Amino acid sequence: MPSIRLADLAQQLDAELHGDGDIVITGVASMQSAQTGHITFMVNPKYREHLGLCQASAVVMTQDDLPFAKSAALVVKNPYLTYARMAQILDTTPQPAQNIAPSAVIDATAKLGNNVSIGANAVIESGVELGDNVIIGAGCFVGKNSKIGAGSRLWANVTIYHEIQIGQNCLIQSGTVVGADGFGYANDRGNWVKIPQIGRVIIGDRVEIGACTTIDRGALDDTVIGNGVIIDNQCQIAHNVVIGDNTAVAGGVIMAGSLKIGRYCMIGGASVINGHMEICDKVTVTGMGMVMRPITEPGVYSSGIPLQPNKVWRKTAALVMNIDDMSKRLKSLERKVNQQD
């Protein structure tokens, strides 16, 4: 278990220390579950009343909240961001052994950097290049001529097809598939003719991809995931999609082929986005959004009907089904009124 003096933690976080700097911090916890040795954080003033019951040895908070502190405190401008950074310092995620498992199958032409770890039953095909400190989990497959940049990690059972490029310091969770064929077919009098998908997938630096997500290779041009992009679990990224730098994609999102999404966008969970169009920079699509047309202006966009009691929803659905008839009747009434005038 990692541990650190509170004074040393404050220095690493560039935080202002209030209280005993010799307190030993052994972990991060929520305000409700924290015990002695834990550090917690408060992001909303409404939780001030809980400080008296909190058992944490220290709390991260803003200057405005400091008068309510009942323990040692680290004062920062952004407690949530500080929480993320101190969680990295005190991370308890198991690290793999720095070795190559005897059962791993590695082609003789593969190039491995320094301190590469490869887990049991992983397969590394010919022409693969793994940078320094790359971690390949148990059961992973890395196809021919693919390249994975320094410091990147694949958890167990990740599949990377051939000719894929993954940048530095990326993290890909278990079950994800990168580089499978895109959904490309031509119709010949009712019969589907497969179009070989000869593009690649290019993933930038510092990209994180959740579990069981699929990113298809391009048909001709590449599918591209920009630097700093984060993609949640069970997303489908179709062929030739381009996602701009630092865009966030929540779970269950489906992106159709040849979609281009700008930088700094946020796509809410379970959204469905049409292909062969563009979304500009700094767009937020709220959960379950259905995006059928290009978005050319930054902002927040929503679609769908939020949850309602069933009886209310049934009435709303009936109104929607009859809206065309109601519109025609309204126009007819308007014409009659205008004629009377």
Curated annotation (Swiss-Prot):
Pathway: Glycolipid biosynthesis; lipid IV(A) biosynthesis; lipid IV(A) from (3R)-3-hydroxytetradecanoyl-[acyl-carrier-protein] and UDP-N-acetyl-alpha-D-glucosamine: step 3/6. It comes from the Bacteria. The keyword Repeat applies. GO terms for cellular component: membrane. Keywords: Acyltransferase, Lipid A biosynthesis, Lipid biosynthesis, Lipid metabolism, Repeat, Transferase. The keyword Aminoacyl-tRNA synthetase does not apply. It catalyses: a UDP-3-O-[(3R)-3-hydroxyacyl]-alpha-D-glucosamine + a (3R)-hydroxyacyl-[ACP] = a UDP-2-N,3-O-bis[(3R)-3-hydroxyacyl]-alpha-D-glucosamine + holo-[ACP] + H(+); UDP-3-O-[(3R)-3-hydroxytetradecanoyl]-alpha-D-glucosamine + (3R)-hydroxytetradecanoyl-[ACP] = UDP-2-N,3-O-bis[(3R)-3-hydroxytetradecanoyl]-alpha-D-glucosamine + holo-[ACP] + H(+). One of its GO terms (biological process) is lipid A biosynthetic process. It is an enzyme of class 2 (transferase). Catalyzes the N-acylation of UDP-3-O-(hydroxytetradecanoyl)glucosamine using 3-hydroxytetradecanoyl-ACP as the acyl donor. Is involved in the biosynthesis of lipid A, a phosphorylated glycolipid that anchors the lipopolysaccharide to the outer membrane of the cell. Belongs to the transferase hexapeptide repeat family. LpxD subfamily. Homotrimer. This is UDP-3-O-(3-hydroxymyristoyl)glucosamine N-acyltransferase. The gene is lpxD.
